[in-house]
Every structure is written in structure tokens, then in C-alpha cells.
Curated annotation (Swiss-Prot):
Expression across tissues: Expressed more abundantly in liver and kidney of females than that of males. Equally expressed in brain, lung and heart.
Originating species: Rattus norvegicus
Modified residues (N6-acetyllysine): 23, 138, 144
GO CC list: cell cortex
Annotated protein name in UniProt: Cysteine-rich protein 2
Entry keywords, A to Z: Acetylation, LIM domain, Metal-binding, Phosphoprotein, Repeat, Zinc
GO molecular function terms listed in the Swiss-Prot or TrEMBL record: metal ion binding
Organism ancestry: Eukaryota, Metazoa, Chordata, Craniata, Vertebrata
GO biological process: hemopoiesis; positive regulation of cell population proliferation
PANTHER family in the cross-refs: CYSTEINE-RICH PROTEIN 2 (PTHR46074:SF2), CYSTEINE-RICH PROTEIN CRIP FAMILY MEMBER (PTHR46074)
Modified residues (Phosphoserine): 104
Disulfide bonds: none
Length: 208
């Protein structure tokens, strides 16, 4: 049975489909959520399950402010600040109260966990190791929360950065060489000059 395109909600037939983010799209429906540029499967960033072009849109919306992820440049699209920080002076806390709080018991594990839980009150589970992901150690990609070291290429296990990797069937891959080897045109390293053919049978005869 043909699936539904998540962009236009119409049936996607085999001849017109591309697969990305674990879903089937019409080729011209796989567009950046911000600028509407047509994207290629695995050649785009992702945030909350939606596709974005790497530059400038993903870097503008979700990258470190003023830094274009993956290259030099600045992509700041924010309104200029109209007000200076209204700080009239340092806030002083009596030393006695601080000491009293320390003697009553310093915050430990439970309070830390409660500060990093999700809206449901429960930490999310990492799709790689199936363990809880707390705020201080999480990165978000493919609509899921991962431990930083767990967001790795499915093929070579290289650690990846959120939005800086390819995707196939909901799994993360590095762009080069792994995604190009597995899912790109045979003999072509997608996105750069070179040849990356890793057939299962290296001793097999070369097809003309």
C-alpha cells in the first residue's frame, strides 16, 4: 500500500518517492521548512522530525549564535536588542542563609534529575543504548534525544553532530564516505570527487 507524503498528505507512488527521516516524500515535497529549497535525501539537517538545509537555515535557527556550522560565516537573523540589561547592582545573599542551606543538605542526584526531565516528568531514552538521557548530556537529532557519544554513524561509528549528518530509515550516517557508499550512486562519493565502492564481494568480477 502506498504511503502518504508528510508534506502534502497525498499518496506517494514508487516512481516519484524519496525516503528521508524514516518517511516517504514526493521528490519536490522534501523541502527546507524555512526557505523551501528542495533537498536531497540524507543531504540535509533535521530538527524535531522536520527537514532543513544545513546552511544557512539550520545554522541560523538552531546553531550557536553568530556561527555558521560547517564553515566560516555569520548567520544572525535576530532583531537587534532594544534594551540594555537592567541590572542595577549585584544581588547579595546573606552568608548565614547560604550556610543554613548547606547544613540542611546539598542538592544531589534526585534534584539534578528533576531539572533535566522532559515535559512528562520522565527523561527520554537514548535510541542507541536505551538508557535515560539527562539534559546535561543530551543532543537532539532525528526527532530523538541521544547521549552525545551515542550519536554515531551506523556504519563506521564516527561520532556525529546534530544536523551535521545524513539519515536513512531513521538511522544516522556520516555524509562521507558512508552515506555515499551505501546509498549514493555506485562509484561516486556523493558531494565530492572520488570513488568509494565497497562491494560485499571484493573478489568478484567487475561488471562492464
Amino acid at each position: 500500500m502506498a504511503s502518504k507524503c508528510p508534506k502534502c498528505d497525498k499518496t506517494v507512488y514508487f516512481a516519484e518517492k524519496v525516503s528521508s527521516l524514516g518517511k516517504d516524500w514526493h521528490k519536490f515535497c522534501l523541502k527546507c521548512e524555512r526557505c523551501n529549497k528542495t533537498l536531497t535525501p540524507g543531504g540535509h539537517a533535521e530538527h524535531d522530525g522536520k527537514p532543513f538545509c544545513h546552511k544557512p537555515c539550520y545554522a541560523t535557527l538552531f546553531g550557536p549564535k553568530g556561527v555558521n556550522i560547517g564553515g566560516a560565516g555569520s548567520y544572525i537573523y535576530e532583531k537587534p536588542p532594544t534594551e540594555a540589561p537592567q541590572v542595577t547592582g549585584p544581588i547579595e545573599v546573606p552568608v548565614v542563609r547560604t550556610e543554613e542551606r548547606k547544613t540542611s543538605g546539598p542538592p544531589k542526584g534526585p534534584s539534578k534529575a528533576s531539572s533535566v526531565t522532559t515535559f512528562t516528568g520522565e527523561p527520554n531514552m537514548c535510541p542507541r543504548c536505551n538508557k535515560r538521557v539527562y539534559f546535561a548530556e543530551k543532543v537532539t537529532s532525528l526527532g530523538k534525544d541521544w547521549h552525545r557519544p551515542c550519536l554515531r554513524c551506523e556504519r563506521c561509528s564516527k561520532t556525529l553532530t546534530p544536523g551535521g549528518h545524513a539519515e536513512h530509515d531513521g538511522q544516522p550516517y556520516c555524509h562521507k564516505p558512508c552515506y555515499g557508499i551505501l546509498f549514493g550512486p555506485k562509484g561516486v562519493n556523493t558531494g565530492a570527487v572520488g570513488s568509494y565502492i565497497y562491494d560485499k564481494d571484493p573478489e568478484g568480477t567487475v561488471q562492464p
